[in-house]
UniProtKB/Swiss-Prot annotation:
Provenance organism: Helicobacter pylori (strain G27)
Name listed for the protein in its UniProt record: 4-hydroxy-tetrahydrodipicolinate reductase
Recorded family membership: Belongs to the DapB family.
Pathway: Amino-acid biosynthesis; L-lysine biosynthesis via DAP pathway; (S)-tetrahydrodipicolinate from L-aspartate: step 4/4
Cited PROSITE patterns: DAPB
Length: 254
């Protein structure tokens, strides 16, 4: 399958290019979208990709777009994909309502998956969190996330997705159950998120289920950002030959 990388100059974008250099599990890097000059030397790649700032040409040259860019960039990408539908794997966070609506329109034409975190471990953590939230009905749930000191958003998109998973399992009102700045006593039907920022931490997420006399903590730690690139490529492989639809990350595990 031919892969197009959108957001190639970013941290994850560069890792995607590195993973695709030798052809990841048969995937071929066919196009790279860049607004300015690309620093990557493609002479060592098994296939020389199209490197362009022409969005339409970029989309035409691939079968699947993997996006790790910025919210405004995703909006432009979706406009091109609505004209020329291709599989989309997007890990960009902070999307506006209008952009998400365009994504839903694309899902009528092509398979796509949008997730805050593409690591296989986080995919499994979401499933475990759902099960624990469902079975441990009397437990108080708290989420702690830690990231590097340059991360812009807080709480992280991954922490919010874990919150949504737990809230859905409990049947909580997702709009009102979230607590990020706690004062006074804890309300029963609430889930707290604490965001820590420091150093160069790639990402750590812990979900605590606190009972009387005992507690359980489920934790995931990213020690290398390459897991996000590899996870996105695994999603691309999984979406191949799928019907047009917006898929959820937990569907990969059945």
């Amino acid at each position: 399958m031919k892969i197009g990388v959108y957001g190639a100059s970013g941290r994850i974008g560069k890792l995607l290019l590195e993973e695709l250099k030798g052809g990841y599990k048969g995937l071929e890097l066919s196009s790279v979208f860049v607004r300015q000059k690309c620093e990557t030397d493609f002479s060592s790649f098994s296939h020389a990709p199209l490197v362009t700032n022409d969005l339409k040409a970029f989309v035409r040259a691939c079968e699947c777009v993997i996006d790790f860019s910025l919210p405004k960039g995703v909006d432009h990408l979706l406009e091109a994909l609505l004209e020329c539908p291709k599989i989309l794997v997007s890990g960009t966070t902070g999307l506006e309502k209008e952009t998400l609506e365009k994504m839903q329109k694309l899902a009528l034409k092509a398979p796509l998956l949008h997730a805050h975190n593409m690591s296989i471990g986080i995919m499994m953590l979401n499933q475990l969190a759902f099960l624990a939230s469902l079975k441990l009905k009397d437990a108080d749930i708290e989420i702690i996330e830690t990231h590097h000191n340059l991360k812009k958003d807080a709480p992280s998109g991954t922490a919010l997705s874990l919150y949504e998973t737990c809230a859905k399992a409990r049947g909580y009102d997702e709009k009102n159950a979230l607590t990020t700045h706690r004062e006074g006593l804890r309300s029963k039907e609430s889930i707290g998120i604490a965001a820590l920022r420091g150093g160069d931490v790639a990402g750590k997420h812990t979900i605590g289920f606190y009972l009387e006399g005992e507690y359980i903590e489920l934790s995931h730690t990213a020690t290398n950002r390459s897991i996000f690139a590899k996870g996105a490529l695994e999603v691309a492989l999984w979406l191949k030959d799928k019907a047009a639809k917006k898929y959820e990350i937990n569907e990969m595990f059945g």
